UniProtKB/Swiss-Prot annotation:
Protein name: Pseudohemocyanin-2
Naturally occurring in which organism (per UniProt): Homarus americanus (American lobster)
Gene: phc-2
Record's function text: Does not function as a hemocyanin.
GO molecular function: oxidoreductase activity
Family assignment from sequence similarity: Belongs to the tyrosinase family. Hemocyanin subfamily.
Top-level division of the source organism's lineage: Eukaryota
Length: 681
């Protein structure tokens, strides 16, 4: 019976061989991408694809557990939830910060990661699509696709097209509904939240950038705080990665503020007023609005979440650990953090993730902080029961309170880093290597350009509708971009042999918003990472040119769902190969946002290039063969032995030491924005 079921499941969708096969099951990537595209197309409606609909009707999850490593434990648990009707209802909201809803999502993640072949994986994905809350399902499916070896070449469609309500103003959604009602295609311009009367409106282009929000949720999908080894492998240096991604967001936000003549972020204080309010102007798919928050509110206890004093207690315990140089684990042992690995432990504690050595004692400062601030508009749930934008990774970056919270957390990390011994000259030297010259080829200039994305998934359609019949309804929003440029670095290798080098490029605002030059030790903490890559240096002079588009810090825009569909169907039809590998990793920043906006007068930045020993830096020899030295790592493995931000991550008591290191170089550059806007009509 089991064999017959497997054959039936496999026969329910066509098999196309010959191109871009995945390991270990040999099913073409094009087939997998096709299936995922249709699972997410019209997410809130029944499946529209005939083969998947047939599979939905015939697949029995309990009949396909023989090859699962856990013997079907995860499937049985999820099926029991289905049978007892304990799953979250459809058309309801979902937040990963809600423990009950999160556990439900993890049941599906476990089921999908237990699948050892594509027929079983897609069968389960199809079956549970109709059983689960739509947003829970998307979170679980995206996470499983990111971590399963079966889907290593599958591209996750952009979430702003899968769940447009999270990224699109209610006003535009209403315009789209009206266009759909009268069956007239439409393209609708969307404005950023707030008005000119709100100073924060000047930088809404950054926090509300849909690509930046996609980066943020993709990072959290790649490095979920709930992850442990039972899901397949351990994620290395997860806590340090958590520190770095948020440190960079804060630093980039600060650089954008300087570009717009705004004062620096004031960090959060639990016992002071929260000055910045926020009205997101967005609604859930079921019509419930995202809660708003007034200006100048006193931070209150939040019912069923936490009290303000709880947050202060957590903070003080973390401060004590930093001051003493150790944390306490569950057995009462002292775990030293005054070393290069301490940042990893501290990050695990602050978030807090499963690797937290003593969660019951240190609590969850970050996650609880998001929930506390998110409920300040209605702390006693008198008017809302829906989560705020701060309780969704897709929307959190839009709220100014996000940056106040993370400035406050970043200050804790800095206190820890400042406790560490500064780097010595020996720590920093790359013997025989010197940076002679740093230059920029091309303009450091930014501009805004209109971007269009589909609202198709926000609209309801008839069940018999086919993809090609979908009406073109879309939103248009301006996005920051920069003109192409290249870094040019002249490096002298005075050794008699080739040397593998790691080239690390950073920049920080040369002056604060008041025009005062930042001291070196202050500037280096505000540095934004622009690139990190490896290069073989021949003996003698080496002139290295690195295009801005090649930066390992950034990734290109993922193709639209329509484009993914068209490319996939063309590959299946045999007219072209499906080659989407450049879009598989979506954890980097959008390549449009590599440099800050700047302004018409030009914003000065100190550009620092550090050339370090590539052999000593690399985790293994395989990295030497890669062209993408990605700083977030891959599949739980971080590829660089050095700490994030090295060599700028530790305090510099005397900047003269830094200037005397021959393998480091620096210069001053200016970034311009001349109010250029490229419109698409």
């Amino acid at each position: 019976v089991l064999l017959c079921s497997l054959v039936a499941a496999t026969a329910a969708w066509p098999y196309f061989g010959g191109f871009q096969r995945d390991e270990p099951d040999g099913v073409p990537t094009a087939q997998k991408q096709h299936d995922i595209n249709f699972l997410l197309h019209k997410l809130y409606e029944p499946l529209h694809e005939a083969n998947l609909k047939a599979l939905e009707d015939s697949f029995d999850p309990l009949a396909h557990t023989a090859n699962m490593p856990d013997g079907g434990v995860a499937v049985n648990k999820l099926m029991q939830e289905v049978k007892t009707q304990h799953l979250e209802e459809r058309h309801h909201w979902f937040s990963v910060f809600n423990a009950t809803q999160r556990e439900e999502a993890l049941l599906l993640v476990k089921v999908l990661l237990q699948c050892q072949d594509w027929p079983t994986a897609i069968g389960n994905a199809v079956y549970f699509r109709k059983m689960m809350n739509e947003e829970t399902y998307v979170y679980a499916l995206y996470t499983a696709i990111k971590h399963s070896p079966l889907t290593k070449h599958v591209v996750l469609p952009p979430l702003y097209e899968i769940m447009p309500h999270f990224f699109t103003s209610s006003e535009v959604i209403q315009q789209a509904y009206r266009a759909k009602l009268i069956e007239k295609p439409g393209r609708f311009n969307m404005n950023f939240t707030g008005t000119q009367n709100n100073p924060e409106h000047k930088i809404a282009y950054f926090g509300e950038d849909i690509g930046l929000s996609t980066h943020y949720i993709n990072w959290h999908i790649e490095y979920p705080f709930w992850w442990n080894e039972t899901f397949g492998y351990q994620i290395e240096r997860r806590g340090e990665n958590y520190f770095w991604v948020h440190h960079q967001l804060v630093n980039r936000f600060e650089a954008e503020r300087i570009s717009n003549h705004l004062q620096k972020i004031e960090k959060l204080h639990w016992e002071r007023n929260l000055h910045e309010g926020f009205d997101p102007h967005t609604s859930y798919k079921n019509g419930n609005p995202f809660p708003f928050r007034h200006d100048d509110i006193h931070i209150e206890d939040v019912d069923k979440v936490a009290e303000v004093r709880d947050m202060i207690v957590m903070e003080n315990r973390i401060r004590d650990a930093i001051a003493h140089g150790y944390v306490i684990d569950k057995e009462g042992n002292k775990v030293d953090i005054n070393n290069e690995h301490g940042i990893d432990i501290l990050g695990d504690i602050i978030e807090s993730c499963v690797y937290n050595p003593y969660n019951e004692y240190y609590g969850s400062l970050h996650n609880m902080g998001h929930m506390m601030l998110g409920h300040q508009g209605d702390p006693h749930a008198k008017y809302y029961d829906t989560p705020s934008v701060l309780e969704h990774y897709e929307t959190a970056l839009r709220d100014p309170a996000f940056y106040k919270l993370h400035k406050y957390i970043d200050d804790l990390f800095r206190k820890h880093k400042d406790h560490l011994k500064p780097y010595s000259q020996e720590d920093l030297l790359f013997p025989g290597v010197a940076v002679n010259m740093i230059d920029i080829d091309g303009p450091l200039e930014t501009y805004f350009e209109d971007y269009e994305y589909s609202l198709m998934n926000a609209m309801d359609d008839k069940e018999e509708m086919i993809w090609e019949d979908s009406m073109e309804i879309s939103a248009i929003i301006p996005r920051l971009r920069h003109k192409d440029f290249s870094f040019k670095v002249n490096i002298m290798n005075n050794n008699d042999e080739n040397k593998l080098s790691t080239i690390r490029i950073f920049a920080w605002p040369h002056r604060d918003v008041n025009g005062v030059i930042m001291p070196f030790n202050e500037g280096r903490w505000h540095a934004i990472e622009l690139d990190k890559f490896q290069k073989e240096l021949i003996p003698g002079e080496n002139t290295i040119t690195r295009k801005s588009s090649e930066s390992s810090v950034t990734v290109p825009d993922v193709p639209s769902l329509k484009s993914l569909h068209e490319q996939t169907e063309a590959a299946i039809a045999g007219s072209s190969e499906l080659n989407l590998d450049e879009f598989v990793s979506a954890t980097g920043l959008p390549n449009r946002l590599l440099i800050p906006k700047g302004n018409e007068a030009g914003v000065e930045f100190k550009l620092v290039v550090a050339v370090t020993d590539g052999v000593a830096d690399s985790v293994n020899d395989e990295i030497n063969l890669t062209t993408k030295f990605h700083h977030y790592g891959h599949h739980g493995v971080y590829l660089d032995k050095k700490p994030h931000g090295y060599p700028l991550d530790r305090r510099v008591p005397d900047e003269r030491l830094f200037h005397e290191i021959p393998n480091f170089g620096e210069t001053i550059v200016k970034v311009f924005n001349r109010d250029e806007h490229v419109y698409h009509h």
